[in-house]
Amino acid sequence: MKRLVCLVLVLVLAGCGAAGEETLSTASALTVECLTEEQDFGGFTASPIADGESAELLVRAVLARYPTGFADQWGRGQILLVSDLRGTDRFTGGDYAGFTQRVGDGWRMVLDGDRLTAGTIHHEIAHILDGLLTEAGVLTEADWMALCPGGFSYGPEQTLYPDFFVDEYAMTDIREDRARTFEEAIRRGPGAYADAPALWLKLEYFSRAIRTHFDTTLWPEKTVWELGLE
């Protein structure tokens, strides 16, 4: 969440248009929209983005790397491009580039278009998948903790276990651990965790849960994240 941090639907990437309501479009689609007025999302606030074209192009390019029809299975969703994303309440003091939240029976991904990276998008996609897989019961805390050092518990200001975690941020929360493991595997590419057996096992477990839950009929033998298992 903090980064510099279902149904079979038809994927429609709408152009960057007006957005900001607290409900999602009733259309069965994933839309990409631009915030047009100041908004408080509950935990985060954001300003309108002056020009979201380059950010929208990056979002399209990232989504194109995922298997055909995959995003269609995430449910109704909205990717909202904003500017000056700020944390409030318990999120104060952080530098945020994006977050995801539930909106009714759908989801919303809010991205700061002024400092957007492909890694941030992959990271937030991992959060969406995490939620769906956890709800479906194919991803469990017990199974994941078995892949961590004995006696470990998530929290701030810990000594890094480089063999088990991508970075210190991954050690703060179980969901951030999964998102960073997924994101970094895509960034590094083939053989991402060849020299890190514990991270390889985490990616393998997350990847297996994804294939268990989703329809993979149109998928390649190896997805963009599974290349990290080579």
Language-model regions, residue ranges each:
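Ser/Thr/Pro/Gly-rich low-complexity linker/stalk segments immediately outside membranes or between
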Residues: 22-27
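Positively charged n-region of N-terminal signal peptides that target proteins for export
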Residues: 1-4
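Zn2+-dependent metallopeptidase catalytic core
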Residues: 50-77
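Active-site-flanking segments in enzyme catalytic domains
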Residues: 74-230
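C-terminal motif of bacterial Sec signal peptides marking the signal peptidase cleavage site
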Residues: 12-15
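Acidic/histidine-rich, surface-exposed loop or edge segments in extracytoplasmic proteins
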Residues: 32-50, 162
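Bacterial signal peptide processing site
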Residues: 17-19
